[in-house]
Amino acid sequence: MANERPAQQSDIKLLISKGLEQGYLTYAEVNDHLPDDLVDPEQIEDIISMINGMGIDVHEVAPDAETLLLNDGNTGNREVDDTAAEEAAAALTALDTEGGRTTDPVRMYMREMGTVELLTREGEIAIAKRIEEGLSQVQAALGTFPLSTELLLSDYEAHKEGKKRLAEIVVGFNDLIEEADAAAAALAAAGPVAVDEDAVDEDADEDGDDDAAEEEAGPTGPDPVEVATRMENLANEYAKFKKAYVKYGAEHKNVAKAREDMAAIFTTLKLPLPLTDALVTQLRGVVNGIKDHERKVLHLATTVARMPRKDFIRSWEGNQTNLEWVEDALKRKQKWSSALRDVKDQIVSEQQGSIEMEKANYLTLAEIKDISRAMAYGEAKARKAKKEMVEANLRLVISIAKKYTNRGLQFLDLIQEGNIGLMKAVDKFEYRRGYKFSTYATWWIRQAITRSIADQARTIRIPVHMIETINKLNRISRQMLQQFGREATPEELAKEMDMPEDKIRKVMKIAKEPISMETPIGDDEDSHLGDFIEDTNVESPIDNTTNINLSETVRDVLAGLTPREAKVLRMRFGIDMNTDHTLEEVGKQFDVTRERIRQIEAKALRKLRHPSRSEQLRSFLDID
């Protein structure tokens, strides 16, 4: 890379020198001198602008001599400044290096995103069909797995008991969809239908978005009666399969036929994605259980008993549930036979576990693995197609995320949330409705971004429903401000929003953003907001000084009394003590009665009320 840069700079210098000499360059000449990995249109536009700024015009084709003469009259006589050309070449090379070889993740993301071509409507439909084919293969594999049928029937029973919605179990019928597709294909093959142009609404939406919206708004979901009929048929076929399994065993042809009949009905039902995921997880759990037993046997035979791995694999294949396998291996009388005999019971126990799994799933281990492989193939096919659809629409996320900047989340976070919404849109896209994917995905992307802003943008999280109320309140407040020329009162807002006034005040209080105590204040920004907020937990300097002066003055005044009178007052009012005392407590201290203490206190207070003493304390009185 270091050796390439001087060569590029030299090429660009020659290009600029040529442009200065002849007064123009063609786009082809510029493109020939740019690196192959520079594909960002904005970077190329910046380079063209920099060349134009040097007084070099860039044309599609070379202009004729007459045009050049009319434009300037100095063509061919411009002074070539080598230093300027070198500086410009270095700048352009740096620009190119920044665009083509950057390590900035944002630029790398943008560049890689730009290499993926946009999809046409036909391309979107082709990918959507591949996704559908992959999911159909997954469902076809699940249909041959009896426990999938059992779980589906169990969920339908929960629906009949009112515990689940029908949409959580069945969303349509695959065979009816295929029939509709075949009819549409036959209609298309028949050729275009003559249309009366006068009867066509000129304002009709070309993309069919309004029709799609109306279709979505109408009644959706499968016919409950039809679902009930098919579920009943599926339950009957499942019962026949179990009966045949009990009678003939897993490998009998009658059992295979019953399983095919059951799968044929299962695959006609279009299942929602959450239920499909649950069925896939169930099958994976069974396969993982089988592999767990096999891993334990492998460990016992090869690690503990020291049986060669190749010998184990060769003899174990097809004997996973053969309880005589260990005995057959011992008959070979190898050097590891003694150690294998020691772990025989453990191996047989694991084989018994595999046999129990066969019985529980009504299939042989080989059949379960075949179903798992078919399911994995369909998943991989659908996942690859979904990846293509997502990558082709990443630009859409960028364009939508730009509208939500400066709302509390960084731009990259907005893109990430938008991409999550895009993936959900890919999962739920139905190409048969006729609208483009971008039309459908925009709503999902926007919802994902706005939801993330509501959840994450604020320092103190506010629930989404409250965010919606706050946004509505702000919108109505702006409208009333424009209408009346002043801020609306809570009473007016409550009337306009048809909400209680106390709730309006609560929403207005919640809507306030927290502010940092370190917020700079003033032009110099040398002080912070926290410096101007009063700390009510700390005594103010004025009050502190006043209390000190009051204490000193009280001591001086008490010094003018007899020691006995001063002590009585100190104890009665708690002066310079932890607490005050009752007449009885003071009397015990002086060994006199309560009445005598009351008389001493009254006499001392009369002395303090004398103007010569009271004047010193009067200034401390609150005359507010």
Swiss-Prot record:
InterPro entries: RNA_pol_sigma-70_dom (IPR014284), RNA_pol_sigma70 (IPR000943), RNA_pol_sigma70_r1_2 (IPR009042), RNA_pol_sigma70_r2 (IPR007627), RNA_pol_sigma70_r3 (IPR007624), RNA_pol_sigma70_r4 (IPR007630), RNA_pol_sigma_70_non-ess (IPR007631), RNA_pol_sigma_70_r1_1 (IPR007127)
Ranges spanned by the short sequence motif Interaction with polymerase core subunit RpoC, renumbered to the chain: 413-416
Region (Sigma-70 factor domain-4): 557-610
Region (Disordered): 197-224
SUPFAM superfamilies tied to this protein: Sigma2 domain of RNA polymerase sigma factors (SSF88946), Sigma3 and sigma4 domains of RNA polymerase sigma factors (SSF88659)
Compartments it resides in: Cytoplasm
The protein's role, per its UniProt record: Sigma factors are initiation factors that promote the attachment of RNA polymerase to specific initiation sites and are then released. This sigma factor is the primary sigma factor during exponential growth.
Family affiliation: Belongs to the sigma-70 factor family. RpoD/SigA subfamily.
Cross-referenced NCBIfam families: PRK05658.1, RpoD_Cterm, sigma70-ECF
Name this polypeptide is given: RNA polymerase sigma factor RpoD
Species, as recorded: Xanthomonas campestris pv. campestris (strain ATCC 33913 / DSM 3586 / NCPPB 528 / LMG 568 / P 25)
Phylogenetic classification of the source organism: Bacteria, Pseudomonadati, Pseudomonadota, Gammaproteobacteria, Lysobacterales
